[in-house]
UniProtKB/Swiss-Prot annotation:
Binds at least 14 chlorophylls (8 Chl-a and 6 Chl-b) and carotenoids such as lutein and neoxanthin. Gene3D superfamilies: Chlorophyll a/b binding protein domain (1.10.3460.10). The lineage of its organism: Eukaryota, Viridiplantae, Streptophyta, Embryophyta, Tracheophyta. It is found in: Plastid, Chloroplast thylakoid membrane. GO terms for biological process: photosynthesis, light harvesting in photosystem I; response to light stimulus. This is Chlorophyll a-b binding protein, chloroplastic. Chlorophyll b 2 binds at R83, I132, L161. Belongs to the light-harvesting chlorophyll a/b-binding (LHC) protein family. The modification Phosphothreonine is found at T18. The LHC complex consists of chlorophyll a-b binding proteins. Chlorophyll a 5 binds at K192, Q210. Chlorophyll a 2 binds at H81. InterPro entries: Chloro_AB-bd_pln (IPR001344), Chloroa_b-bind (IPR022796). It comes from Glycine max.
Length: 245
């Protein structure tokens, strides 16, 4: 008999958890003696945070990881968002860096670049008319939905043949450099990825706040701060919103 949809869902969660388990002996990032969020001053972690997965510092005051299925889903969401945040942070900084070094490709500020599609000439990807010349925001939106939907569907379904057992770390053709061949090295890379991903998500949040408050990109804000650190810093900008000022 064929399994029901709920059974398939439970099986998929269990499979992901099993496939994502890390075998790492003596690592400071895994197991009961792993590094905790407050170091030696950390309290006893919840019983369900055993140090089995990368990035587990024993901190979950809201109990978000208490349910195994919710924990598995949240872990997947965190890793995927971390990867997009790392790409996004690089995409926010790199155009500004190029522009500051004399490369001309249109608007360098990440939050202003997209608005060029509403201009009369439209938007040239990388400032090059021979690449993609976009003139319709609806067409771009539809294309993004189709492309991203196809990629996510491919990942979640396990590839065309369903041979990928772990959508978070698929391996195979997704690992052309064979970085996952050594289990110990792979376990450490998972920790590095999630740590840098969390920093990238905070960075993206900071970029959004900077854009709203200063109307400038991250490198321009950094240059302003280095030039006048007393007048250009988070505290100085925050006090501008104090009532009566």
């Amino acid at each position: 008999a064929s399994p029901s949809t709920p059974q398939l869902g439970v099986g998929r969660v269990s499979m992901r958890k099993t496939a994502s388990k890390t075998v790492s002996s003596g690592s400071p990032w895994y197991g009961p003696d792993r590094v905790k969020y407050l170091g030696p001053f950390s309290g006893e972690p919840p019983s369900y945070l055993t140090g089995e997965f990368p990035g587990d510092y024993g901190w979950d005051t809201a109990g978000l990881s208490a349910d195994p299925e919710t924990f598995a889903k949240n872990r997947e969401l965190e890793v995927i968002h971390s990867r997009w945040a790392m790409l996004g942070a690089l995409g926010c900084v790199f155009p500004e860096l190029l522009a500051r070094n004399g490369v001309k490709f249109g608007e360098a500020s990440w939050f202003k670049a997209g608005s060029q599609i509403f201009s009369e000439g439209g938007l040239d990807y990388l400032g090059n008319q021979s690449l993609i010349h976009a003139q319709s925001i609806l067409a771009i939106w539809a294309t993004q939905v189709i492309l991203m939907g196809a990629v996510e569907g491919y990942r979640i379904a396990g590839g065309p043949l369903g041979e990928v057992t772990d959508p978070i770390y698929p391996g195979g053709s997704f690992d052309p450099l064979a970085l996952a061949d050594d289990p110990e090295a792979f376990a450490e890379l998972k920790v590095k990825e999630i740590k840098n991903g969390r920093l990238a998500m905070f960075s993206m949040f900071g970029f959004f706040v900077q854009a709203i408050v200063t109307g400038k990109g991250p490198l321009e804000n950094l240059a302003d701060h280095l030039a006048e650190p007393v007048n250009n810093n988070a505290w100085a900008y925050a006090t501008n919103f104090v009532p009566g000022k």
